[in-house]
Amino acid sequence: MKKMLALLSAVLMTGAFLIPSAHAQDIRARMKQRIPQIAELKKSGVIGEDSKGYLAFVNGKGNPQADAVVKTENADRKTVYAYIAKKENVSVDVVASQRAAKLAQIAKSGEYIQKNGKWVRK
C-alpha cells in the first residue's frame, strides 16, 4: 500500500507519468494546463476535492466552462488511476481513495474537501 501511494504521489505530484505512449504526454499537458482554472474554481468555492479522488461541485453545477474543466480533469484522473491500479494489481477505487486522502491533506486553507459525505472548508 505504501508503495502504491508513493507511486501515485510521484505520478500526480511531479507529473512524471508512467503511462506509456504519447497519450501520457497529452494527459500531462492537459492536466497542467487546467491547474490555474481548477485553482480559481477551488478558491471561489465552486468545486472541491471529493472523498473519491475526483473534483466535484460543492453546490450543484457550475457554468458550462466549469463543467467542462471538471469533466475533463476527472476523466484524465481516472485514466491515471486505472494505469496505477493495473500496475499495482489493485482496484481503481483503492488508488482513487488513496489520492483523495493526499489531496485532502494538501488542500489549501479555505478550499472545500469532502469528509464523511459532507463538504467542509479546510
Features from the language model and the residues they span:
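Contiguous, amphipathic alpha-helical segments that mediate oligomerization or scaffolding
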Residues: Y81-A82
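Sec/Tat signal peptide C-region and signal peptidase I cleavage site
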Residues: L18-A24
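Amphipathic, charged alpha-helical segments and their helix-to-coil junctions
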Residues: Q25-A68, T72-A75, K86-K122
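Hydrophobic core
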Residues: L12-F17
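Bacterial N-terminal signal peptides that target proteins for export
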Residues: M1-L8
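Cleavable N-terminal signal peptides
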Residues: A10-V11, A22
